[in-house]
């Protein structure tokens, strides 16, 4: 498909928090603004993350120096043939029809966010990545239709990496902001919008996320904002009114109030917030009351934002103790193993629920419940990160439900109204 040109933007207008409605004549497939999103991410499926599926990386040995740090190096080290063999088996088994059925019928959730890399749709010359994900994505969307679950297609990695995180496909690089890489990303959005934004998917795909977690402080907001605008019009010129999802790029709440508004000629825009409190020593030093106060504060701040907003990633984690959470070869900040951190307390036993004290369990439950309340008060719902892992307890939705840390059903409360909303 030939990429359409970016339409000139309408003049800027002062935006204020209003009750947004879908553009007349458009069909979103989900009533943002009046219906809440209750979802899970299908992390580690089409974009590898070592902390979610460590077994794929541990196959390289016990020495971290010999373990690939991301999917780029995973495929490069194995070569195309072997990488395709291993990953095809992973794609076929990590998420099955049983999972989508359980998400809908057991957990009573209404949406899945599906991270996928640009390489699933279009490779760059010399890319080591392998393809084949698209067929499994299509199969998953068929299961979503069967069980009444909505989906976001989330471009989790773009060429050169938008943040340097391993979950972008390429760790420790920030090479996305050049014309060729951005154009390749737009071409991928054009393809996704033309296929998954078409009428036959309108009842399932209710969001196309242009890029996951672009690191605004590192790559600059000018590049990101221009890409968001061009990506929006690329989706619209593909003939799709599907909601366009933009990530907050790690900016303060209300930063985007005057950006891509209906007054400026944009419509069906959703803002995606990701909230964690474990990726700095200062956050880890907070006690449970301070963690919850931060959650409540974020919820209040977000409640005044202009756009529809979803808290598209968050977790129960109160530590960064999970193996490889900070990356292959990097230990936790909590015990001082991470470069530049300092010892606060031990990680011993944090990954085994059997070793948790009743206080540990109660504090984690309180933290989850506060977030559920805040993300619904401050926004239009939430999507938990992530549905399943091999052994990352604090991040694993299913294990947390099984062990009474995540409420089941999700509206059950042992610690109601912690924020006083």
Curated annotation (Swiss-Prot):
GO terms for biological process: fungal-type cell wall beta-glucan metabolic process; fungal-type cell wall disassembly involved in conjugation with cellular fusion; glucan catabolic process. Disulfide bonds join 296-419, 321-347. GO terms for cellular component: division septum; extracellular region; mating projection actin fusion focus. Belongs to the glycosyl hydrolase 5 (cellulase A) family. It is found in: Secreted. It is an enzyme of class 3 (hydrolase). It comes from the Eukaryota. This is Glucan 1,3-beta-glucosidase. Residues 1-15 form the signal peptide. It catalyses: Successive hydrolysis of beta-D-glucose units from the non-reducing ends of (1->3)-beta-D-glucans, releasing alpha-glucose. Transmembrane segments: none annotated. GO terms for molecular function: glucan endo-1,6-beta-glucosidase activity; glucan exo-1,3-beta-glucosidase activity. InterPro entries: Glyco_hydro_5, Glyco_hydro_5_CS, Glycoside_hydrolase_SF, Glycosyl_hydrolase_5. The gene is EXG1. It comes from Yarrowia lipolytica (strain CLIB 122 / E 150). Its EC number is 3.2.1.58. It holds the Pfam family Cellulase. Its main location: secreted. Keywords: Cell wall biogenesis/degradation, Disulfide bond, Glycosidase, Hydrolase, Secreted, Signal. Coiled coil: none annotated.
């Amino acid at each position: 498909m030939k990429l359409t040109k970016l339409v000139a933007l309408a003049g800027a207008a002062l935006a204020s928090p209003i009750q947004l409605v879908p553009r007349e004549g458009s069909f979103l497939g989900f009533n943002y603004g009046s219906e809440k999103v209750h979802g899970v991410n299908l992390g580690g499926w089409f974009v590898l993350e070592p902390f979610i599926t460590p077994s794929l990386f541990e196959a390289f040995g016990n020495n971290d120096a010999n373990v690939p740090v991301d999917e780029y190096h995973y495929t490069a080290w194995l070569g195309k043939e072997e990488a395709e063999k291993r990953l095809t088996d992973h794609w076929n088994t990590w998420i099955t029809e049983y999972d989508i059925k359980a998400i809908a019928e057991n957990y009573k959730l209404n949406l899945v966010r599906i991270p996928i890399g640009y390489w699933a749709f279009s490779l760059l010359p010399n890319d080591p990545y392998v393809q084949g994900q698209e067929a499994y994505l299509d199969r998953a969307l068929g299961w979503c239709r069967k069980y009444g679950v909505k989906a976001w297609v989330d471009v989790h990695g773009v060429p050169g990496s938008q943040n340097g995180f391993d979950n972008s496909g390429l760790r420790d690089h920030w090479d996305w902001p050049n014309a060729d890489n951005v154009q390749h990303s737009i071409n991928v959005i054009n393809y996704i919008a033309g296929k998954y934004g078409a009428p036959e998917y309108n009842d399932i795909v209710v969001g196309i996320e242009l890029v996951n977690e672009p690191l605004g402080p590192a790559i600059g907001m000018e590049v990101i904002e221009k890409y968001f605008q061009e990506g929006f019009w690329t989706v619209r010129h593909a003939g799709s009114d599907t909601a366009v999802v933009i990530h907050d790029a790690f900016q303060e709440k209300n930063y985007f109030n005057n950006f891509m508004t209906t007054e400026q000629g944009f419509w069906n825009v959703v803002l995606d917030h990701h909230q964690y409190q474990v990726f700095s020593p200062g956050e880890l030093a907070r006690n449970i009351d301070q963690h919850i106060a931060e959650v409540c504060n974020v919820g209040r701040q977000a409640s005044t934002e202009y756009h529809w907003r979803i808290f598209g990633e968050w977790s129960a984690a109160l530590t960064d103790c999970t193996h490889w959470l900070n990356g292959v070869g990097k230990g936790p900040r909590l015990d001082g193993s991470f470069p530049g951190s300092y010892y606060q307390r031990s990680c011993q036993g944090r990954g085994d629920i059997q070793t948790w004290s009743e206080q540990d369990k109660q504090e984690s439950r309180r933290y989850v419940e506060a977030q559920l309340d805040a993300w619904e008060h401050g926004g239009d719902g939430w999507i938990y990160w992530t549905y399943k892992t091999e052994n990352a307890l604090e991040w694993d939705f299913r294990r947390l439900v099984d062990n009474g840390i995540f409420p089941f059903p999700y509206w059950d409360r042992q610690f109601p109204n912690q924020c006083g909303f």
